[in-house]
Amino acid sequence: MELKLIQGCVSEDRVSQRQLFETYGNKFMAICKRYMQDDMLAEDVLMESFFKIYKNIKKFKGEGSFEGWMRRIVVNTAIDHINKKNKSVLRYCEEVKDEAAVLPEVINNLSTKELMLMVCELPVGCRTVFNMFVMDGFTHKQISEHLKIPEGTSKWHMSKARILLQNKLKRYESDIRI
């Protein structure tokens, strides 16, 4: 099934391209929304990603997962978009106080959607590094290369993202206790 779909897209068959989009569009839109705060920007990144997938599908050699290959294009497109729009923002993330850890039961009571909304509220630099490191498995070295920032800055953004999320979780915890 997947091989036939790939071959159809290589041949620029519109039905195959539509089927590929319908099969993976929602999954990849979730990735785009993790990186972009605005749904319209997320849709733009998704469309640009599929354009790149269709354009470069001939380069897929069948080594590894096809979905993984496409996912990398989606993530890289989102990162490229952030780099273009926010060159200076990636170098700065607001300073916050480090507080005690959040109770594990608070995290367990959160839905995935609620947690992802908290991640989306992070400043762009922190959110981008958090997504790349935690969600997409990049190392700090890879993040620094992709975002063209020092490796230490990547680690700093990750640390600040963790602190900001802890603060959000504490506010959530105090809200549910009231």
Language-model segments: which ranges?
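Short alpha-helical "packing" element that flanks the helix-turn-helix/winged-helix DNA-binding module
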Residues: L115, V129-F130
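Internal acidic/polar
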Residues: K87-T112, T139
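N-terminal module of bacterial RNA polymerase sigma factors
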Residues: M1-K27, R34, C120, K141-Q142, ...
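Short, small-hydrophobic-rich alpha-helical interface motif
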Residues: C9, F28, C32, A42-I53, ...
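DNA-recognition helix of helix-turn-helix
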Residues: I79, C126, M135, H146-Y172
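Arg/Lys-rich amphipathic alpha helix in sigma70-family domain 2
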Residues: K58-G62, R72-Y92, K160
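Sigma70-family region 2
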Residues: V10-S11, Q37, M47-S65, K85
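Short helix-coil-helix linker/hinge
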Residues: V119-R127
